[in-house]
Amino acid sequence: MSSVSSTIIQDIKTICETGRALIGYFYFDFRDVNKQHWRHLVPFLITQLSSRSGPHFDILSRLYSDHDSGARQPSDNFLTKCLKEILTLSDQWPIYLIIDAVDECPNTSGILSPREMVLQFVKDFVDLRLPNLHICVTSRPEIDIRNVLDPLTTYQVSLHHQSGQKKDIEDCSVCCLLKGFGADHEKVEEGGQRPRNRDAL
């Protein structure tokens, strides 16, 4: 996980501990096949978000029972519907979704690559226009990713090997914490050479 995402997550977790708020986060990793696909992202977010209250847990329990007590895998559409239901049910709380390192999701050839599915997922949830939903996406500035995210983004932070990087991270964290209007969505781009250890930008 990148240092900028770690900073944002820790700040938001502090808010979640002192008040009613929900956080879900996922990071892609080209070294781990379990962290390279949209199908791993959505169940992870569902589990995180549904663990905070009774109504959310009821949705998770229904998902389990509707698929023969876990014997059958739910379809992509069913998982997406379940996540949307959780987000809609949580309209009284701020919700923060952090998706880290989208560039490490494979962009393979085919009808729809794993990366394209993730980008479509982000677009679909931004289009929900939930006033309490805040989405932060981090990635290297690759063209296909920018083409999708740039039109959706209200706040961007570019991290390069230049002075002021620490301030950018702090600004992005504050932005995620304080913006409370519209379906806010932030994008953080990493510049320069990708480090092997994503904790050390």
What spans do the regions from the language model cover?
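Conserved NB-ARC/NACHT P-loop NTPase core of NLR-like innate immune receptors
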Residues: 1-201
